[in-house]
Amino acid sequence: MAEEKKHYMTLEGKKKLEEELEYLKTERRKEVVERIKIARSFGDLSENSEYDSAKEEQAFVEGRISQIEKMIRNAEIIEESEGDANVVSLGKTVKFVEIPDGEEEEYTIVGSAESDPFEGKISNDSPMAQSLLGHTIDDVVIVNTPGGEMEVKILEIR
């Protein structure tokens, strides 16, 4: 059997996944089973859209449970103190300024399981993170973004 991919995440990210898993197993699963029971009571299952919808939801919930269990099983916790404090790496927050417009941005580089660009968390697999990883303060880096390449200067790493 091939070795499963490590899922890099912070301790906080792992706790969120564990909470979601608990919710799915204890509450959501029961809600879906109840929906299936109610839909079955409507009679003929061959043309029962409520039943079909509930079964699809059940498949989604069970798939998500399986996905989360796999991520937790293969979790590699990112310790905040790991690595050189002056080098952009997994778990670090990096602040940079776009050249030449001067706009400052800040992102924390996390594992893909907990990335959320709206919260300033980008996946270590993203093109932007890949461009920044391994660089130090004052480095000028060409960063790949969905809108194309941009030049940035790293201001702070923490």
Curated annotation (Swiss-Prot):
Q: List the disulfide bonds.
A: none
Q: For this entry, list what GO says about its biological process.
A: DNA-templated transcription elongation; regulation of DNA-templated transcription elongation
Q: Mind listing the UniProt keywords for this protein, alphabetically? A: Coiled coil, DNA-binding, Transcription, Transcription regulation
GO MF annotations in UniProt: DNA binding; RNA polymerase binding
Known Gene3D superfamilies for this protein? Transcription elongation factor, GreA/GreB, C-terminal domain (3.10.50.30), Transcription elongation factor, GreA/GreB, N-terminal domain (1.10.287.180)
Q: Name one Pfam family in it.
A: GreA_GreB
| Record carries keyword Coiled coil | yes
Domain of life of the organism in this record? Bacteria
Q: Which residues form a coiled coil?
A: 10-76
Q: Which family does it belong to?
A: Belongs to the GreA/GreB family.
Q: What does this protein do?
A: Necessary for efficient RNA polymerase transcription elongation past template-encoded arresting sites. The arresting sites in DNA have the property of trapping a certain fraction of elongating RNA polymerases that pass through, resulting in locked ternary complexes. Cleavage of the nascent transcript by cleavage factors such as GreA or GreB allows the resumption of elongation from the new 3'terminus. GreA releases sequences of 2 to 3 nucleotides.
Tell me the HAMAP family matching this sequence.
GreA_GreB (MF_00105)
What protein name applies here? Answer: Transcription elongation factor GreA
- Gene symbol here is greA
